[in-house]
């Protein structure tokens, strides 16, 4: 039995039949940042494409890299052949084809595979090697797909490729919950699924009883679907959804409303205090026995007003679990590591003080200086004297470096772990709960980031050799701070997220509406959606 996502199943197929794919041994799979960074490193190849500016907007290299990634991901998942686009008379379409071809060449040359390519490579393998497909079909007799409304074109092709002549395919989904169009998903797949079979072959079983939501919420939902259909919204659902009326499993015995309003008149401090009082009131009344029974839903957990609320609650003793809020670089353990690492390279710090780095914005300068201030403040404590002296010795060594060291940047970080507070953090027992483990998890993620940087830039030691008039150690030290970490800081990086425990004990959860799908909480607080939907 195969159980997993489309991507995990495709990756398994690729690994089991690697010799038939276009990949070589030890291929590397790119995450979203790796993909953008790879394009960024090769941006000159894309900019050399004729009529490149008709397909990609005229902006900085990093933003162009992100735009290119979006384009090639969408084209790949639609199984578009770059040669077909390149032959088009429209110069923009032809340029898109060239962009896709250059991108595919980069992946091939470096034995790389991005997230989208996991599915396209599996599809290519199965359609080009009938024996492999036949072997797979002999193993897979029945296929069940959940959340079918969130599938895209290539996933639909894979489903029917796997299904073969058996056609034992069961899909479950709700066309009214198609939330992932922005990722390429299409509700067309579930709406038109019965049409893929001969008359009478496909049995449709309506599931209209809602066992999860309060009847007030179900009634509101049904009314909303009626309200949005017609002249008032200038829209007709018709072919865009299956006609249905959802029924609640039962009517509540209580006559009190399931939804209450908690708000303030554009006063952020009052808003914070009301939410705190609301949570504390639930605790004191006994209705709340663990903070993990509450979820806060937002359009974005990265918004400044959301992160301010998180900091306010944490300052009042209520832990917040929000791994995708991109607060990774604001965590004290990460700021301290960065600050201590910088202090070991005095020449870099001098350049920072003199604002010599043209690619850093005022925000980056403020952040890095803040990290150094945090480090100096910690090291000024007499109890940190050994750590302070060690950093000073390293800084003096690197300033006057005469011969290559036997360590790189990651090696320095690992050496730092001998000292408090890092030694204390990393010695935390693994069974104390996710919140207490968060600093250790974040430190582990940071070491992974630096290790990946060294791998991508082929750095293993600190080298004093001169290249183009400057020491390599000085050039290389600027790259992680002024480029790699800067881009990660700008793009955001999620903290450690435990898939086995989506609502860790002792924490209120801050989630996006998309992120919360499929989860259940006794108490849900929904942030204002502003003026949408109108």
Feature-to-residue mapping (PLM):
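A basic/glycine-biased coupling hinge at the interface between accessory DNA-binding modules
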Residues: 1-120, 138, 167
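Conserved helicase/translocase P-loop NTPase motor core
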Residues: 3-10, 94-142, 152-158, 274-281, ...
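Inter-lobe coupling/hinge region of RecA-like P-loop helicase motors
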Residues: 23-29, 105, 201-212, 230-298, ...
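Phosphate/oxyanion-binding active-site loops and adjacent basic polyanion-contact surfaces
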Residues: 35, 111, 115-118, 213, ...
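Walker B catalytic acidic pair
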Residues: 147
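ATPase/helicase motor core of nucleic-acid motors
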Residues: 196-199, 257-259, 284-437, 447
